[in-house]
Amino acid sequence: NEIRAKVTTDVATGAGTFDVVTVGMYEVPLWAALGWIDEVGPTLDASPEYDSADFFDSIRDGLSLDGKLYAAPFYGESSSMFYRTDLFEEAGLMMPERPTWDEIAGFAEALHDPDNEQYGICLRGLPGWGEQGAPLGTVINTFGGRWYDADWNAQITSPETTEAIKFYIDLVTNYGQPGAVSSGFTECQTLFLQGNTAMWYDATSPSDVNFDINQNPFADRIAIAFAPTKVKEPSGWLWAWAFALESVSENKEAAYKFMEWATSKDYPQLVADSTGSWGGVPSGSRASLYENPGYAEFGAPFNPVVLQSLAEVDPLNATNYDDTPYQGIQFVQIPEFQDLGNRCTQEFAGAMAGSQSADDAIAKCQGYAEDVAIEGGYK
């Protein structure tokens, strides 16, 4: 949340505090269209060793505008379900390779033991379009919901979207971690690494840490499944953290040298050699990493799910409808969504905390979304 706000302010005002900024798939096409960041593909590819064609198509496409690359991907991710195999075995439960959300809810109830600080599932409750909003967005999609219909009428109060939001709130409230509204990615990962949660639905990117016995004492007792579904399949998100070059930068040559080095084919091997482990390398962006014998061996427990998830996502048609007017899986790719997502997730956090009902939170979000459609000229 903090880096997004700081970078957005700097780029939008042309302050030029930074030369290189860390951005994601939501910002890149929007900022490229506004001329805030430079096209970087031709300069990076001027180096014969760089090979931007090595980036996964879904990652490259998400960081491009009109086929031109505007940010160099550091790592990429979809979403998945991590779980403790030992706890499942003890309870006589079996996680399917592709679970449904109804199955996940049943598992969470069965494995929830708060008296012993073991929680059924950890889900992000921290407000923020890229925090709580990311996993919640995939739940909305797979339940058959969406933010807007073809005519840009807000759909938050539609039966499908309402069901998805209430399901998410109920799941984390009844069988999730305490203080969920303060839990983002980092907090949930900490709980998972400490052995306090039986399941964790989040990005595929922490697989490298989760399955590294040097960083996770439970690494030999976990497994990974595909993102859960209900109606729409598949349901994983798509994201990449990438380096973009501010158009107002006065140090572009140095900036390019950094981007080329940090997103090169050789960088993951450098990290592994420097740390003595593959558990800290940036993954999910370059195909060549998965051809590296060392990483292929390390990632054998999770690479098949990660690679298949990245291959099957469709940000152009993430909902259960053919006429959805926006692009994006866990976000709506319009400039106003950053504020809209933040405001709505704040309301949903209020419902999680018990300060208002889920119905009231949903109604408020519906109003915010309608205002955006009208004031933004979409409707």
For each predicted feature, which ranges?
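C-terminal lobe and pocket-closing loops
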Residues: 205-218, 231-343
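Conserved C-terminal helix/tail region of periplasmic/extracytoplasmic solute-binding proteins
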Residues: 89, 313-379
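Extracytoplasmic/periplasmic solute-binding protein
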Residues: 65-74, 79, 103-154, 166, ...
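Hinge/lid segment of periplasmic solute-binding proteins
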Residues: 24-78, 132-135, 139, 219-228, ...
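Glycine-centered hinge/linker elements that transmit conformational signals in sensory
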Residues: 107-110, 150-182, 223-227
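A structural signal for short loop-to-beta-strand junctions that line the ligand-binding cleft
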Residues: 9-10, 16-19, 48-87, 119, ...
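Extracytoplasmic "Venus flytrap"/periplasmic binding protein-like
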Residues: 1-55, 64, 90-92, 189-191, ...
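Short glycine- and hydrophobic/aromatic-rich loop-to-beta-strand nucleating segment
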Residues: 79-83, 140, 243-245
